[in-house]
Amino acid sequence: MIICKTPFRISLFGGGTDFPIWFNRNNGMTISFAINKYCYLSLRELPNLFPFKYRLRYFINETSTKITKIKHPCIKGILKKYHKSHNGLEIVHSSDIPGLSGLGSSSAFTISMLKLIHKYNKKNLSKDQLVRKCIDIEHNMLHESSGYQDQYACAYGGFNYINYNKNNIKVNKIKITKFNLENLISNSILVYSGIQRKSELIEKDKIRNINKNQENLQAILEISKEAKN
């Protein structure tokens, strides 16, 4: 059995400047940190004693005889692209936090799934490779509308500021003293409101209005720079 975990993230500054439609014409910067709450995925080969080839357990239980008949879009997409053997698989998901909570759960799931299937294929991926494959799955296969900060924050972990431009994306570790880190933690409260929403609708609205909001996004970028300093 292979088990992978990926942290969720809290975004502090710069949201909206991590969209390609923005940073391909302007610069972008986000500041975020990973937290000690995780998305867990496990994978094991399924014995060929069952009337199905794939058994999935997430918020529902699902069985399927073919990858193309799997209902979960992310699992189906990743298996279709990277699972080349004929072995049956069981994949189980669990999480410290409910989905749709605004903490990067979608990207955390995709990153975990990519780590899982590549470990199964006996291949190691760098953090940058993980991010690029995650973006490819989410944007090109699942056609999701999202920025890039969640993929980087979940794959890299830690406390970082991320610079975006059309030629390069760079993750920079924020150097913070133990005292200041403990001060930040002791003065922060993470509360579950019970409200769940699909970020896809919010992100599509951001992209649709990005030309109208250029002044606001530029101001968000300047605030991010000030916060970094």
Feature locations, PLM:
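Short pre-catalytic strand/loop immediately N-terminal to key active-site residues, enriched for Gly-Thr
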Residues: 89-101
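C-terminal nucleotide
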Residues: 1-13, 18-21, 32-85, 117-123, ...
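Short clusters of hydrophobic/aromatic residues that line enzyme substrate/ligand-binding pockets
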Residues: 31, 97, 103, 162
